[in-house]
Curated annotation (Swiss-Prot):
Pfam families: Mucin15. Keywords: Cell membrane, Glycoprotein, Membrane, Secreted, Signal, Transmembrane, Transmembrane helix. The lineage of its organism: Eukaryota, Metazoa, Chordata, Craniata, Vertebrata. GO terms for cellular component: extracellular region; plasma membrane. The chain crosses the membrane at residues 233-253. This is Mucin-15. Highly glycosylated (N- and O-linked carbohydrates). Residues 254-330 are cytoplasmic.
């Protein structure tokens, strides 16, 4: 945003400068044309004189009486040209001023006003004095359009024989320079053509941001490394202490449980005496039926009593006569 605003301000200022330079060139050309026309009118005008001899004698008398005043003689064309150039330069200076810097113009000093010189033909120029004849040039400065109007300057020289010689600087047209103020409404659109004459400079202003990666690198502090090492040592010590405490508790629990198991019931007692039977059938209240197979392995005394009482012979083998034959498949 700031870069675009700067570019727009630079474009506006450059356009104002270009407009002012074109206005100055137009004023200079108008002033030059008016000065050339004034010189032509001065050359074309004829001066009625009484006689050539009187004119030359008066000129000699003026030069001998006041040599310094001879520079102001009317017949010297270079003097008049210098005066005309002075007024043209004055008008150029008045009109070429920038309206933005000098909105109002102050009246000029009386030395720049036009004057009337009474030069008698038969007397010295020292007896005469320069009298102001016309008002200062009218300078009109309207606020709305800022027009600078220069009035014509009349130089009148009177002779004692009631013959007047009038030289008037009348331009062909009013030397008016109108400068319209430039009004900018809103932000003008910038195109590629308008940006060709300008070089864009990148801003080097550092703007504060909210992202800070590492403050210790920008602002070094001697206490930060010690605090980091201290925190690391605390964490490592806590982890190591927890591991050692858990291992110690497990060892104590194992030792206590081992001692309790030795005092409790053990299955090894069953195998201490091999001769002691695990299950004895001699103490049975009723004798078992030992007719199936050889039951002497379990209770030989019961076997003897059963044979004497029942009269049945014990068979060592399993009888297979009662088993029906297998059916053959058809």
């Amino acid at each position: 945003m700031l870069t675009s605003a700067k570019i727009l301000l630079i474009s506006i200022l450059s356009s104002l400068l270009l407009f002012g330079s074109h206005g100055e060139e137009g004023q200079k050309t108008n002033t030059t044309e008016s000065t050339a026309e004034d010189l032509k009118t001065m050359e074309n005008q004829s001066v009625p004189l009484e006689s050539k001899a009187n004119l030359t004698s008066d000129k000699e008398n003026r030069e001998t009486s006041n040599p310094k005043a001879s520079n102001f003689s009317f017949e010297d064309p270079s003097n008049k040209t210098h005066e005309t150039g002075f007024y043209s330069n004055l008008s150029t200076d008045n009109s070429s001023r920038s309206p933005s810097l000098m909105p109002t113009l102050s009246p000029r000093s009386p030395s720049t006003h036009s004057f009337v010189s009474k030069l008698p033909w038969n007397s010295s120029i020292a007896d005469n004095s320069l009298l102001p004849a016309s008002a200062p040039p009218n300078t009109t400065v309207p606020v709305s359009s800022e027009n600078f109007t220069l009035s014509s300057i009349n130089d009148t020289m009177k002779a004692p024989d009631n013959s007047s010689i009038t030289v008037s600087n009348l331009p062909s047209g009013p030397n008016t320079t109108s400068v319209t103020p430039m009004v900018t409404e809103g932000w003008p659109t910038t195109t590629r053509e308008s940006m060709e004459g300008f070089t864009v400079y990148q801003e080097t202003t550092l703007h504060p941001t909210l992202k800070f990666t590492n403050n210790s690198k920008i602002f070094p502090n001697t206490s930060d490394p010690q605090e980091e090492n201290r925190n690391t040592g605390v964490v490592f010590g806590a982890i190591l202490g927890a591991i050692l405490g858990a291992s110690l508790l497990s060892l104590v629990g194992y030792l206590l449980c081992g001692k309790r198991k030795t005092d409790s019931f053990s299955h090894r007692r069953l195998y201490d005496d091999r001769n002691e039977p695990v299950l004895r059938l001699d103490n049975a209240p009723e004798p078992y039926d030992m007719s199936f197979g050889n039951s002497s392995y379990y209770n030989p005394t019961a076997n003897d009593s059963s044979t004497s009482a029942g009269g049945e012979n014990a068979h060592d083998s399993i009888p297979m006569d009662d088993i029906p034959p297998l059916r053959t498949s058809v």
